[in-house]
Amino acid sequence: MRFPLFHSRNGLRFYLLRGIALSILLVLAVFAGNVWQVYRTGNQTLPAAATADAAVVLGAAAWNKQPSPVFLERINHAIALYQSHRVGKIVFTGGTPKKGYMTEAEVGRRYALKQGIPAKNILFENTSRNTYENLRNIKPILRANSVDSIIIVSDPYHFARAQAIARDLDLNAEVSATPTTRFDAREKKGRFLFQESYLLFLYQFESWGDRIWDWITRNG
């Protein structure tokens, strides 16, 4: 069977342009879906009766051995969950961008100890550099300490990506947003929403690529 359109320059150009247009539309549709997912997930609230073995505080910047305002909000929220007996432990995550500086996890732990949280109820990993590593690196620590369920603590728009990662890592996770956030201003909120939608898209693209490659290597 012959396909005349493919045997002319105009026919080939038509199919090429149509393929590019469809690809762009697909990317835009996925991105729009991500924006909605990030927004919807960011407006979810933790059920009043929800409890877990531990609260996991996703890392954020630390300055001169002190938590940044964003990190402080996350730490205080995890402490509130602990003090209200909704979690039994607090897990801090996060490394350092520069050698010689105190890690985010160590800054969080230090602050929590000063607030009266017993050292035996604080766990941490201090080598991660991003959200995926935060959650991946705590997995063996959770297992070693018989922690079967967690509540992830972060800013609202961070949760769509955090949930996707937790799901891929087979973590039994709920999410709980900080009651206040430094991203409340409309401009900052919009920027954070766009940024997280973009990062979720990149994570999905990489995750789908890995799955396709795994399928090819298994069946090739």
For each predicted feature, which ranges?
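A structural signal for short, hydrophobic/glycine-enriched beta-strand patches
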Residues: 3-5, 33-194
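A transmembrane-helix-recognition feature enriched in membrane-embedded lipid enzymes
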Residues: 36, 186-216
